[in-house]
Amino acid sequence: MEKLRLLGLRYQEYVTRHPAATAQLETAVRGFSYLLAGRFADSHELSELVYSASNLLVLLNDGILRKELRKKLPVSLSQQKLLTWLSVLECVEVFMEMGAAKVWGEVGRWLVIALVQLAKAVLRMLLLLWFKAGLQTSPPIVPLDRETQAQPPDGDHSPGNHEQSYVGKRSNRVVRTLQNTPSLHSRHWGAPQQREGRQQQHHEELSATPTPLGLQETIAEFLYIARPLLHLLSLGLWGQRSWKPWLLAGVVDVTSLSLLSDRKGLTRRERRELRRRTILLLYYLLRSPFYDRFSEARILFLLQLLADHVPGVGLVTRPLMDYLPTWQKIYFYSWG
């Protein structure tokens, strides 16, 4: 037990001292998950396990860096715990679905889907109604920008002391002065002005308080949160081949977005969330039964056409053609 505690402390120290290397590790783990997909039997489950682990690793490392840098989330401790649990569920939901299908079959798979969606809905309702958290965003916790947030200042960089950069007279290239060059492990290779702009923008995003929602916006958000449960309930009533669950979910999503479309004064992150939800309406082209009857043949034909006539594109489109049927059948990929 003592060895595990020491190992944990060493890992925390490594993350705080080498945030850039930690980010590279997270990217490597995520990339490894892509390489595993479709390579052998049960590779999809293993690939998703590695991908879920990479997302949990990002969440863990961000928590370590926030604690070290004292950059707490601008919310209460109880709300932070709810956001963390919601983030964990979003990280592992696909693997839980695939694992349940492998172990318990279709009945176990749908039971796990229903339990996960119910848990997420309860957490989001608490955030919306109890904590007045405003618009629900994805991901629930803003990931840290390692280049701008995880770099401790090396000395006083205030403009009053000395210039942070030098502009070449002939090349107009911006170069950091020697006095403002940070230590090697935390060095940022962009121009100082770029870093400052990103720091300011990311700081505003992290510290921005959610926009208070009126009755209309609260109803819209309630519909958005309830949509997965309504869709699952309609699937149980009318079956997976019926158009009614597809139409019901689409109407609920469009209604929610329509009620939110006139809201002014949203934060940058909330505006980005609304754009994300609007773009996700395209997923209805990939959701059954529309996909089975209309989209599948056309999408596969287009991918095959690109693979046959555009050099190099086949390296991407052929694996995509192989994986698309598997992806489309996973509930949390297409409907989550």
Swiss-Prot record:
<protein>
    <recommendedName>
        <fullName>Peroxisomal membrane protein PEX16</fullName>
    </recommendedName>
</protein>
<dbReference type="GO" id="GO:0006625">
    <property type="term" value="P:protein targeting to peroxisome"/>
</dbReference>
<dbReference type="GO" id="GO:0005778">
    <property type="term" value="C:peroxisomal membrane"/>
</dbReference>
<dbReference type="GO" id="GO:0016557">
    <property type="term" value="P:peroxisome membrane biogenesis"/>
</dbReference>
<feature type="region of interest" description="Required for peroxisomal location">
    <location>
        <begin position="66"/>
        <end position="81"/>
    </location>
</feature>
<feature type="transmembrane region" description="Helical">
    <location>
        <begin position="85"/>
        <end position="105"/>
    </location>
</feature>
<dbReference type="Pfam" id="PF08610">
    <property type="entry name" value="Pex16"/>
</dbReference>
<dbReference type="InterPro" id="IPR013919">
    <property type="entry name" value="Pex16"/>
</dbReference>
<keyword id="KW-0861">Zellweger syndrome</keyword>
<dbReference type="GO" id="GO:0032581">
    <property type="term" value="P:ER-dependent peroxisome organization"/>
</dbReference>
<dbReference type="GO" id="GO:0007031">
    <property type="term" value="P:peroxisome organization"/>
</dbReference>
<dbReference type="GO" id="GO:0016558">
    <property type="term" value="P:protein import into peroxisome matrix"/>
</dbReference>
<keyword id="KW-0472">Membrane</keyword>
<feature type="topological domain" description="Peroxisomal">
    <location>
        <begin position="106"/>
        <end position="110"/>
    </location>
</feature>
<dbReference type="GO" id="GO:0016020">
    <property type="term" value="C:membrane"/>
</dbReference>
<feature type="topological domain" description="Cytoplasmic">
    <location>
        <begin position="1"/>
        <end position="84"/>
    </location>
</feature>
<keyword id="KW-0812">Transmembrane</keyword>
<dbReference type="GO" id="GO:0005789">
    <property type="term" value="C:endoplasmic reticulum membrane"/>
</dbReference>
<dbReference type="GO" id="GO:0005783">
    <property type="term" value="C:endoplasmic reticulum"/>
</dbReference>
<dbReference type="GO" id="GO:0005777">
    <property type="term" value="C:peroxisome"/>
</dbReference>
<feature type="topological domain" description="Cytoplasmic">
    <location>
        <begin position="132"/>
        <end position="336"/>
    </location>
</feature>
<keyword id="KW-0225">Disease variant</keyword>
<feature type="transmembrane region" description="Helical">
    <location>
        <begin position="111"/>
        <end position="131"/>
    </location>
</feature>
<dbReference type="GO" id="GO:0106101">
    <property type="term" value="P:ER-dependent peroxisome localization"/>
</dbReference>
<comment type="function">
    <text>Required for peroxisome membrane biogenesis. May play a role in early stages of peroxisome assembly. Can recruit other peroxisomal proteins, such as PEX3 and PMP34, to de novo peroxisomes derived from the endoplasmic reticulum (ER). May function as receptor for PEX3.</text>
</comment>
<dbReference type="GO" id="GO:0045046">
    <property type="term" value="P:protein import into peroxisome membrane"/>
</dbReference>
<keyword id="KW-1133">Transmembrane helix</keyword>
<dbReference type="GO" id="GO:0022615">
    <property type="term" value="P:protein to membrane docking"/>
</dbReference>
<keyword id="KW-0576">Peroxisome</keyword>
<comment type="subunit">
    <text>Interacts with PEX19.</text>
</comment>
<feature type="region of interest" description="Interaction with PEX19">
    <location>
        <begin position="221"/>
        <end position="336"/>
    </location>
</feature>
<dbReference type="GO" id="GO:0005829">
    <property type="term" value="C:cytosol"/>
</dbReference>
<keyword id="KW-0958">Peroxisome biogenesis disorder</keyword>
<feature type="region of interest" description="Disordered">
    <location>
        <begin position="142"/>
        <end position="171"/>
    </location>
</feature>
<keyword id="KW-0962">Peroxisome biogenesis</keyword>
<feature type="region of interest" description="Disordered">
    <location>
        <begin position="184"/>
        <end position="210"/>
    </location>
</feature>
<feature type="compositionally biased region" description="Basic and acidic residues">
    <location>
        <begin position="144"/>
        <end position="160"/>
    </location>
</feature>
<comment type="similarity">
    <text>Belongs to the peroxin-16 family.</text>
</comment>
<feature type="compositionally biased region" description="Basic and acidic residues">
    <location>
        <begin position="195"/>
        <end position="206"/>
    </location>
</feature>
